[in-house]
Design a protein with these regions (language model features):
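A short glycine-rich, His/Asp/Glu-containing loop-to-beta-strand
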Residues: 23-59
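N-terminal leader/targeting helix
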Residues: 1-26
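Short acidic-glycine-tyrosine-enriched beta hairpin
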Residues: 81-96
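Short strand-coil-strand connectors
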Residues: 38-40, 78-82, 105
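Ligand-binding loop in jelly-roll beta-barrel domains
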Residues: 96-121
Length: 125
């Protein structure tokens, strides 16, 4: 009898390798983000100690969905005319194609996941 804790067998030709990413050696994006682990359909990035800004960052639209989680600090997220304040422990979603921008209120650290991966094919530019 198979133990309930045993993982399902790998399918032939399927990549089942695990990848560990050390953020100290990860590439950085032009806006200050650190690119973390990335798979075929989702990628992670870290915004670390982003400093307050006056909110003059222009809004943008991306062809990927973003979900995020606030580790520390505070920011305002503006999406399609709506504003939410993000505090430690909050999470959020920015739908693909939605016009959005962030205004950092206090030194801000957050992790985001994007689907499809933001840094592939110039999506993050």
């Amino acid at each position: 009898m198979k133990d309930a804790k045993d993982p399902p067998p790998a399918r032939e030709g399927r990549d089942t390798s695990v990848h560990k990413i050390d953020s100290r050696h990860s590439p950085h994006g032009r806006d200050g983000q650190t690119y973390l682990a990335s798979g075929k359909s989702v990628a992670m990035r870290l915004w670390k100690d982003e400093q307050p800004n006056d909110g003059d960052k222009p809004a943008s639209r991306r062809d990927y969905e973003t979900v995020g989680y606030v580790i520390s600090g505070r920011a305002e997220l503006h999406v399609e005319g709506q504003k939410v304040v993000l505090n430690p422990g909050d999470s959020w979603v920015v739908p693909a194609g939605a016009e959005h921008t962030y205004k950092v209120l206090e030194s801000f650290t957050a992790v985001e996941a994007t689907s499809p991966p933001a840094q592939v094919h110039g999506r993050d530019e």
